[in-house]
């Protein structure tokens, strides 16, 4: 009987040992899986934090760069009116000494406004001779032209402006079209 017990014990021992190893490995495998999952979650959280930080930095830079957009848009009418005032003075009055100082004052004011625009990243859109760009130009009329290629800006009714890389106001333009024969 003792031999039978020994035989049974020997047979049982190999069967119980893999089971014990499996039980020991199972918690380690489970812990390694959880550890890997937590590592991935930490990496994801770090990446998300970095993305949020970048987005906030960009929003902050945009806010400071474009903070004056509304005010700048309002000032464009001042620039337009100064230009109209200068254009309305006939050549014969420009030679008159009595008008000369007024003209000089208007020119200096227009130049100073242009300098302020430049310092704040506001630039005039060069429209004449350019191809119509719907992102910068607003076509108001098509004009027949034998000299210009169709789709080319041949008339500027109102100047357009950019503030840094954004459109502040589109240029109102006339575009060439093929003349009717």
Curated annotation (Swiss-Prot):
Subcellular location: Cytoplasm
Record-linked CDD domains: GrpE
Cystine pairs: none
GO molecular function: adenyl-nucleotide exchange factor activity; protein homodimerization activity; protein-folding chaperone binding; unfolded protein binding
Source organism superkingdom: Bacteria
InterPro entries with a match to the protein in the record: GrpE (IPR000740), GrpE_coiled_coil (IPR013805), GrpE_head (IPR009012)
Pfam families the record matches: GrpE
This protein's GO CC annotations: cytoplasm
Record region (Disordered): 1-26
Keywords, sorted A to Z: Chaperone, Cytoplasm, Stress response
Biased composition (Acidic residues): 1-24
A biological process term (GO) from this entry: protein folding
Function noted in UniProt: Participates actively in the response to hyperosmotic and heat shock by preventing the aggregation of stress-denatured proteins, in association with DnaK and GrpE. It is the nucleotide exchange factor for DnaK and may function as a thermosensor. Unfolded proteins bind initially to DnaJ; upon interaction with the DnaJ-bound protein, DnaK hydrolyzes its bound ATP, resulting in the formation of a stable complex. GrpE releases ADP from DnaK; ATP binding to DnaK triggers the release of the substrate protein, thus completing the reaction cycle.
Family classification: Belongs to the GrpE family.
Self-association and partners: Homodimer.
PANTHER family recorded: GRPE PROTEIN, GRPE PROTEIN HOMOLOG, MITOCHONDRIAL
Protein's name according to its UniProt entry: Protein GrpE
Origin species: Rhizorhabdus wittichii (strain DSM 6014 / CCUG 31198 / JCM 15750 / NBRC 105917 / EY 4224 / RW1)
Taxonomic lineage of the native organism: Bacteria, Pseudomonadati, Pseudomonadota, Alphaproteobacteria, Sphingomonadales
Gene responsible for this protein: grpE
